[in-house]
Amino acid sequence: MQTVLTSLLRSEFLRSGLALAKGAWKKGITLALVALLATSCSGVFLAETESNPWEVIALPTEAAISDVAFASDGEHGWLVGSRTTLLESTDAGKTWDPRILELGEQNYTFTSIDFSGDEGWLVGQPNIMLHTTDGGTSWSNIPLDPQLPGQPLLVTATGKNSAEMATDIGAIYTTKDGGQKWKGLVQSAVGVVRNMSRNEEGRYVAVSSRGNFYSTWLPGQEAWQPHNRENSKRLQNMGFTKEGLLWLIARGGQMQFGTEQTEYEEWSEPINPEFAASWGLLDVAYRTPEELWVTGGSGNLLMSTDGGETWMKDKAVEDVPTNFYRIKFLGQDRGYILGQRGYLLRYEEAHSNLV
C-alpha cells in the first residue's frame, strides 16, 4: 500500500513540476515575443519629427494639380493641373484664386510650368504651350507642330527667350528665340514614360510607363540611354539628388540611391524607410543636400536629415485626406506638396525647428 501511495505521490509531484516548467516556458516565450515585437516595431513605426513645417491649404478646385512655379519676386505664383486649371497667388502661395484664360472649348491638362525671372512657360495636353514675359499678367499661345512626337510633359525655363520642352515619349526640344523656332536634341524617342525629371545641369531621367526600365539623357548625347531596373520590383518614380546622383522609388515603398553619375547603373542597397507605409511612397525632394522629404499615399510624409540613413515621420499631416503625389522645393525656405481633391501643403520655415 505504501509503495502504491509513494508511486502516486511521485507521479503527482512530477506532473506538478512539469506543469510549472511548462508555465515558465510559456511565460519565457511570451516575454521573448514581446521583446522581439518591441524591437521590430522600432524599425516599422518611425519617430515623429520635432515640428511640422507644413501648412495645409484648401484650394478652390478639386482638379489634380500637376506643378507649381513662381515669378522672380517669389510672391507671384502659379499652380497648374487638369480641367484647364490655372490658379494664381500674389502672397507667396498663402492663398490661391482661379485664373481663366480664353483657350476655346478644348479642355486641357496642364502638366508643367516654369519661370526664369518674369518669363514663364506652361505646357499641357493635348498639345499646348503658353508663354509670358510679365510674370503671368498676360499669356500668349505658342503654336506647336501637329506632328510633334508625343505630347508636352515637362518644360524648363533656361534663360531669356529660352526654354527646353520634353514630351511624354522622350522627345526634347530647345528654343532660344521665345518659341518661334525649336531644335531637337535627341535623334529618337524613348517610348511612353510614366514620369520624367530634369536637374539643373540639363540631365534627364525617365521611367517607362510600366516601370520595367529607366532611361537617362545627358546634354550632347544623340539618344536616351536605357537601363534595366535594379531588381524585380517595378519602378514608381526617379529623380536627382542635389549632387546629381539618382534616387529611385520602387513598388512596395523600396528606395535606392545612386552611387555614381556616369553610367547611372550603380546603386546602394535597397531600403524601406517605413514598412507600415511602404506600399505608398510616390515622390522625393531635397530641401538641402542632406535633408530630403518623401511623400506617399494616405497622408504619408517622411523626412531624413542625413541623406536617407535614418528617418522620421511628420504625423501632423497624416490625417489629411489625400495622397501626396508630388513634392517640390523652390529653395530651402519654399516648398510645396501637391495633393488631390484640392489639397496643397506649403512649407513654412518659421514653423520648423529642423536644421
Predicted regions and their residues:
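Residue-level hotspots at or immediately adjacent to binding/recognition sites across diverse folds
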Residues: T39-V355
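Bacterial N-terminal signal peptides
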Residues: G28-T39
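Bacterial N-terminal signal peptides that target proteins for export
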Residues: V4-I29
